[in-house]
């Protein structure tokens, strides 16, 4: 199983599909929503036992769009809580990659940055990243159009700078480029889901900017290309 997956989250696709990317994010981590009786309102989260899951909990990093940030703030909180819940489980490292990586990064922040444990854990656990408040885009499209780049490292730097704002809990867009860069450099797989035939990756440069930018960042930082997938749920 891959230890780290990066996903691109757009608002419109999740509205139309009733949250397919959100559900995928939760399930990869082995977390499921608890629904209020008699409705589809989520009133909590619960852990899927490893015996039922039959695989490790996979670490997922979300790169959200500016519109996703604006339209789904409560969903971002659910996603953040799911990460923390998965990380709290006292399970073997080879069966809980979320906990494994957060523990490793927490220790690194304590030793190298001198951070207190709770603050280091909180920073290490951010998995929802996007633009700064009030801004939109991945930065890559403008960079390519202006021809103001020379190597893939330039594209990666712009992608990290634009997307390196963390969301979760009381944090609303804290600029943590090194944390986001570390997440990008760890990815084994990248995913961008498509839910209809109205648009496709040849219709807009946003596909290249968000997903292509993520792939470029992984190639630059990690030194090798991730496996990259475009999920197709148009026949749902």
What are these regions (language model features)?
Residues 1-236:
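Ligand/cofactor-recognition surfaces for anionic moieties
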């Amino acid at each position: 199983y891959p230890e780290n997956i990066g996903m691109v989250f757009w608002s419109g696709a999740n509205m139309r599909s009733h949250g397919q990317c959100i559900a995928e994010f939760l399930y990869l981590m082995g977390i499921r929503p608890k629904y209020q009786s008699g409705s589809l309102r989520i009133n909590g989260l619960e852990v899927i036992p490893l015996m039922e899951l039959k695989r490790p909990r996979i670490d997922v990093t979300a790169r959200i769009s500016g519109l996703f940030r604006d339209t789904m703030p409560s969903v971002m909180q659910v996603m953040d809580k799911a990460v923390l819940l998965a990380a709290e489980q006292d399970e073997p490292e080879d069966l809980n990659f979320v906990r494994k990586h957060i523990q490793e990064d927490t220790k690194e922040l304590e030793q190298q940055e001198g951070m207190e444990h709770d603050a280091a854990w909180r920073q290490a656990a951010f998995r929802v990243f996007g633009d700064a408040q009030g801004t939109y885009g991945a930065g890559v499209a403008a960079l390519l159009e202006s021809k103001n780049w020379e190597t893939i490292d330039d594209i990666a730097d712009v992608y990290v700078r634009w997307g390196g704002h963390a969301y979760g809990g009381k944090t609303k867009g804290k600029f943590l480029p090194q944390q986001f860069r570390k997440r990008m450099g760890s990815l084994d797989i990248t995913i961008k889901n498509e839910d209809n035939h109205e648009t496709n990756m040849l219709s807009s440069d946003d596909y290249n900017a968000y997903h292509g930018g993520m792939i470029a960042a992984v190639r630059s930082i990690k030194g090798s290309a991730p496996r990259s997938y475009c999920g197709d749920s148009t026949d749902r």
